[in-house]
C-alpha cells in the first residue's frame, strides 16, 4: 500500500511539473517513470509472497532502488551544504550562468538569477557582471536576452560583459574565464605607465588575484563550484539565487543526474 501511495504521489507531482516546466522537455516526464517503478516494486512483493519469483530477485531490485534513493539524499545534502550564508562583497567579477531566458514565466530560474545579480550590483557597484550563455533550444542567445533585461532594469551596459559561445555549465565557466582574462589584459594595457629613466629603480608589484563570484540558482551552486575548482578557479565564491518552491524537488532530482554525469565525464 505504501509503495502504491508513493506511485500515486509521483504521478501527481509529475503532472504538476509538466504543466509548470513544459510539455516538450523529456526530462519532465521522469516522475511518471518513478510512479511506474513504485507500482512495479509493489507488484514484485506480491509476486514473491505468491511464490512466483525467488527472494534474491526481490532483494536485488530493492537494493538497487535503495542505492538510488541514497545517492539522491547524499547529493541533496551536499547541495544544501554548499549554499553560502552571505554573499562575498566587493568581487571583481560576477559570472551569471546562463539558462533558458523565460523571463515572463512564473518561477523563472533565469529571472531569479538576474534579479539576484541586480541586488548584488546595487550593493557592489564596482563589480563587473559577466553574462554567460550561447544559443538555446529556442534559438535565442541566452546571454544577450539576459543582458538586455539587466540594462532595462538600470544596470550600466558598460558594466556588463557578454559571453555567447557556451552551451553548458562547464563551457559557461571556461569561456567566461577567457573573457575575464582578455578584459583584464585590455584594461592593464590601457593603464600601463611609461617609466622615465631618471626616476630611479622601480619595483614591479604582482597583480592582485581576481576575485570572481559564480551566480546561479541554489540547486545548481554545488556543481558549478565543483566545475570551477576543477578548471583552476582560485579566488571564487558562490552567489546563490533562489528557485521556485514547487519545482525544487524536481530540480534536485535533475541536478542529481547532472552531477553524476559530470562526475563520470571527469568534469568534477
Which functions belong to the PLM regions below?
Residues 1-2, 29, 53, 57, ...:
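Structural motif marking the loop-to-transmembrane transition
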Residues 1-47:
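Membrane-embedded alpha-helical segments of integral membrane proteins
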Residues 6-12, 64-70, 74, 253, ...:
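Lipid-exposed faces of alpha-helical membrane segments in multi-pass integral membrane proteins
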Residues 12, 19, 103, 138-139, ...:
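Basic, gly/Ser/Thr/Pro-rich low-complexity segments located predominantly at protein N termini
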Residues 22, 80-84, 266-267:
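Transmembrane helix-loop junctions in multipass membrane proteins, especially transporters and channels
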Residues 41-85:
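Transmembrane alpha-helices and immediately adjacent membrane-cytoplasm interface residues
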Residues 73-254:
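A structural signal for short, hydrophobic/glycine-enriched beta-strand patches
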Residues 252-268:
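A transmembrane-helix-recognition feature enriched in membrane-embedded lipid enzymes
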Amino acid at each position: 500500500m505504501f509503495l502504491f501511495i508513493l506511485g500515486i504521489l509521483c504521478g501527481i507531482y509529475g503532472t504538476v511539473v509538466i504543466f509548470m516546466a513544459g510539455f516538450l522537455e523529456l526530462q519532465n516526464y521522469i516522475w511518471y517513470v518513478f510512479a511506474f517503478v513504485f507500482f512495479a516494486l509493489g507488484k514484485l512483493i506480491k509476486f514473491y509472497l505468491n511464490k512466483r519469483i525467488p527472494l534474491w530477485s526481490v532483494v536485488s531490485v530493492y537494493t538497487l532502488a535503495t542505492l538510488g534513493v541514497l545517492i539522491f539524499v547524499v547529493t541533496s545534502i551536499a547541495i544544501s551544504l554548499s549554499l553560502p550564508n552571505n554573499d562575498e562583497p566587493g568581487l571583481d567579477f560576477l559570472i551569471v550562468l546562463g539558462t533558458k531566458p523565460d523571463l515572463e514565466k512564473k518561477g523563472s530560474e533565469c529571472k531569479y538569477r538576474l534579479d539576484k545579480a541586480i541586488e548584488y550590483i546595487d550593493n557592489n557597484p564596482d563589480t563587473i557582471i559577466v553574462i554567460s550563455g550561447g544559443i538555446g533550444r529556442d534559438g535565442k542567445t541566452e546571454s544577450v536576452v539576459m543582458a538586455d533585461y539587466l540594462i532595462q532594469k538600470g544596470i550600466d551596459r558598460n558594466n556588463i560583459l557578454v559571453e555567447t559561445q557556451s552551451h553548458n555549465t562547464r563551457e559557461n565557466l571556461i569561456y567566461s574565464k577567457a573573457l575575464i582574462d582578455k578584459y583584464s589584459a585590455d584594461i592593464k594595457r590601457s593603464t600601463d605607465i611609461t617609466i622615465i629613466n631618471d626616476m630611479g629603480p622601480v619595483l614591479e608589484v604582482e597583480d592582485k588575484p581576481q576575485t570572481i563570484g559564480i551566480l546561479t540558482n541554489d540547486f545548481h551552486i554545488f556543481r558549478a563550484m565543483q566545475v570551477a575548482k576543477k578548471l583552476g578557479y582560485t579566488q571564487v565564491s558562490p552567489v546563490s539565487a533562489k528557485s521556485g518552491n514547487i519545482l525544487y524537488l524536481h530540480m534536485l532530482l535533475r541536478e542529481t543526474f547532472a552531477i553524476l554525469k559530470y562526475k563520470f565525464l571527469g568534469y568534477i
